[in-house]
Each structure stands twice: as C-alpha cells, then as structure tokens.
Amino acid sequence: MKTPRSVVASITSQLSQAGLISLLTLSSLGALYAAPLPSSFGVWDRGEAMDPKIYPYLRGTTCDSPWNEVEKADGVYDWSILDKSLERAQRENLSLYLSFEAGPKTPNWVYTKGVPKVLTEGGKKADSFPFYPYYLSPVYKTYYHRFLFAMANHIKSYPKEVQQRISFIQVKTGCTGDECPYKGDAVDEKYSLTTKGAEWRAFRLETFALYNKLFGKASGLNISLLLSNVEPETEDGKADFVEEWKWATANLQDGFGIKNGALSRGHHLSGERSSMTMFLPYLVDAKGLTLFRRSEMDQTWTRPLYQLNVPLNFYWGAINALNSGQSVWDVTKSAVEQSKAQGFDYSFYFFNKYAGQIYPATATHAFCALHKGLDAADVVAYPEAEFGKAAHGNLERMEKIRAVYGKYGAANDDKKALKLGQVGQRGDQAGFNDVGWNIWPDNYSRLLYQIAPDETSIPLWRVGGPITPTSPIYSRFARGFEAASAKNALYFRLHEGFSADASPKVMTLTVVWYDGVAGSTWKLDYDIGAPTMKTALTVTGSGDKKWHHEVVTVKDAVFRHGGTKGSDFALINTDHKDDVFSLVEVNRGGQELPALRPPTDVRPVGGFAKGTKYNSDKSKKGGK
C-alpha cells in the first residue's frame, strides 16, 4: 500500500514550517553545543538499571528509545521508556545519554505506507535483523523526521532540571550504533547502500543536520551529539569518513562526541595507536575544538584473553582508555555484577578518578603507567633492513623484535593472534602478546610524562614471572633501573599548566614499585625552584617480591620543570641494585583517604575462568 501524495505533502509541509526540510542548507548557522561536564565522565551502565547504591562507581546510564517501541501505531507515541529512564536518572542523581534507533527498528506500519522492505544476504551478521527500510525513500525520511521532531518536542516538555540530566545524544542513522545501513548486502541491488558510499553519506549528513537543528543550541535544548564513523584523514591516507568530519567540525564548533569501542576492551590491540593519536589533541587539553569520547565493555571480558587474569585485564583496559582520552565507559551488566566478587571494580574507580582530568590548570590528579609496546608497524624504531618487511602478517619480523627484549620478559604467547584485527583478538586471543601491529608504544598517561624513558631506564614485562590468574595487576608492564648500563633514574614532567606558577604547593606523590631485591635503595627527588632538587623520600627494599605503594606529601613543590632534564620529580637509584616501578601518581593537596588500592587477594570465580572464543560461539554476538 502506498501513501497518498497528499499525506506526504501534508507532513512535509508541517516539517518545512518547523524548519526541518533541507537542513543541510542550514549548516552555515553552525549550532554550538555544550559538551557534557567532566564531572559526569567515568563508568556508566548500558541502560540495565544497575543500582548505584550497590555499584557506587556508576556515574550514568543510557536509554535507547527505538522508533518501533515509541510509535507502534501511526502518530501514536508511547514515551514510557524515556520517561522512566529520566525519572530514574533524576531520582538516583545519574547522568543519561539517549539514542533513538530506527533503521531495522522502524515500525512495521511504515512499510505499509510505501517504504521498500530491504532483505540482505552475505556478511558476518546478515541474519541480525529480518529486513531494513530503504533509507533513501522520501516516504521513509518523511516519517522518520516526524518521529525525531516529536521526540524533541517531548524532551522540551520536561522541566529544565530533568532536561539537564541528558549529557548527550548518540546519533544512530542505521544499524545499532555501527552506522552501517545494513548487516550484509541488499538482495535487490537497486536498494544497495554501502557504509562508505556517497548516497549513505548524504543520508547521514542530512540526519546529522536534523539532530543539530532539533536538539542543539538553536533549539533551546543545547544537548551535545555523539557521532560514529566521523574522523579526519589518517596518517596512512585513509579518508573514509572525512566528509563527515568536515561537516561536524564546521557545524558543531563547540564540540561533539566520538565513539571508539575497542580502546577500553583491552590493550595491545591492532590499530590502537592510530586511534589514539588521531583524536587525543581534541580530548585532553584541547586547543579550540573539544571532543569527548565514549567506549563500551561488551562481553569481551568473558573471552579467553580477559579470563587469563580478569582484574589485570580490566586495569590495563582502563589505563589504555584513559591514555586515549576516553570520557565515558559503558560497562555491560554481567561485568558490573561480577566486578566486586572478582576484584576488578578497582579499575572502575581508577577510571572515574582520571576520566575528567582533561584541563591541566584545573586537574587535581595525574598519572603515568610505565609501559612499552613493541609496535611492529613502526619502521623507525624497527628498521626493515634489520627486522624484515613491515607487514601485519610478518610473524618473523614480530619475533625478531620480541627477541631484542626477551631478556626483559617480553614474549608472544599467542602468535596466531598477532595476525588478527582487534575484533578477532578480543574474541579469540588466548595469550598475552608484547608485540603487536600499530599498538601504543610508550607509557600510558594522563597529564604526567616520563622524560627520555629508553635513555634512562629499561622496559619490563611479566614482572615476577609468567602471568597467572592471580598475578598482581601491576606485573603486566613496568620500567626499572639497570645499573649495569648506567640507567639509574626515571624523570617525570607534568603537563604544561598543571603547575601554573613558581609558588610552593602542596602535592602528594604515589609510587607503585616491586620489592624484588633485599637491601636495594632508591629515592624520590623533586623540584622546589632551587638549583638542586630536594629529596622527599628514601626507600630500602626487603626483597619480599611484592608490589608496594609509597606515598609522600610535600608542601614546597614548585614543579615548573626546574629539575634534572627539565623534570618536576625523579626516581633515583642510590645503589647498584635494580628497582622496578609500574605506576606514578600526583595529586594536588594532601593524601586522599581512604586510599584507592587494588585488592591484594585475587581469586578467580567459578564459571568464568576459561572464556568462550568468538569462533566457538555459534551466535557470534557479543551482546550486553
């Protein structure tokens, strides 16, 4: 059944009067957005109504109000999903982000109006949904736009204090949040649309402009948007979503959100380096355009690699995400529920502590997690003439790189996984690899950096021996002294602006170190604005083979890079024995109590120990 032209014309007239037709022509207006407050950055649940009294690290939640649930009948709206979510957010003092999924969640009645029903075949998830709308159908766009217009009006009906619970809206133009038109390929070629194609791009940009008009500053709601598949040209010349990036940066000039699911789901994942470097200047101490970043933890944590040591993997996943400037970490229900029993809720508190530390002048905390990733894609660090051709599948090159650092603990436990992309690694990798392809090569940090790490210290992996299910979280990566090669100091420098002037300040420093040698000694020196650094702490080891937290508060810290090598403070070897360090933290003021510490007793919980590979999971769905 086709919709009469008079009906389409009537609806189109209504939308046109509201200024919602041909919105791309309005892009020159450049709507401005108020980005979510950094105080809302941290761990969120994925809309599963987890109780923040039981899980106090939760700072927010999500609400998807899919079109087929809201408008089950033509023009009849059921707002109960959204109403209940906002009521809960207000009651429990949570932030909330929204999405309004359409695409395969288009109401069935829309197809009776003349919208073509698209069937798909092929692809990994072609059976995810039975059918899809043809997005370019004028009838589809007419009713879809009407739905979004009604959604905006309903949000405007809430009191201001309720509206302010909404941190951002994730724009979903196609399937779920993946931003593809279909899972698989259209059976009928005349309905074919591809994720990187011009027709799909035009539809997305039109939808972006619609959201901009309906929910942005000009609408009075002033809600930020989060966009997927939006990025500048990459270092290797890829320009798949550059037009989307250009539109967003021209029209959402006060900032917007981006999605990157992988960075909080693990470490040493293929492609993570490019993903970090591309956006980090817009996320931490941004100059001009400011972005925020959302990522999620799905069922990756139940897969083999994570299950080798769950607390350790969650910790380094959190560290990896913070290093990339991540703002919001959506965590699946199963992980939230198991977090305390399995001892990895520490990682959520740690993430919360640092997620909002994005402006050095106002930041209260900074950290540097000591690490070296052996990136086989780096031909400067590992020349092809010495290590072989730089190709993702060149395992011989990867093994040659690893061999250089084998004496420091570097190993590749699952060589097959070295060839995989990050999705395959998250699902099927069954061992820790210290070499990778396009992985992060340096320390992980937020506003605190080590100076010349390889010149003054050595990298270390698997401190204390092979990683087991009960190994301490810090044992995965570290750096240390090597007296035999005259590497006897680790120098650190805070981000410019963290210490604004030369006046004395109260600062607390925390050093996590491994006590591996009885009688070993080291000290912490810091910048007081004098020609020589001052000693704040001296430590003597007992050799107990355990990780320790040393905490010292100083009241005369200047931290204006006046120490040795332009440092603010340094860890100095005071004998010929070698000490090992994993984490260094700085916070303004005195020590915070109770101190945030990881559990000392890690016990694997029955039923979660082995993990399930993607290729042995018939559904192949991560789920929630």
Language-model features and meaning:
Residues 570-577:
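Short beta-strand-plus-loop segments that form exposed binding edges in beta-rich domains
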Residues 35-135, 298-301, 326-336, 348, ...:
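N-terminal substrate-binding region of glycoside hydrolase catalytic domains
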Residues 101, 254-433:
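Substrate-binding cleft of secreted/luminal carbohydrate-active enzymes
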Residues 90, 128-168, 203, 207-210:
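An active-site-proximal structural segment forming one wall of the substrate-binding cleft
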Residues 170, 177-181, 196, 205-208, ...:
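Substrate-binding cleft/loops of secretory-pathway carbohydrate-active enzymes
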Residues 388-497:
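Glycan-recognition and processing domains
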Residues 519-531:
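Short, surface-exposed beta-strand/strand-loop-strand elements in extracellular ectodomains
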Residues 531-563:
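Extracellular carbohydrate recognition and processing domains
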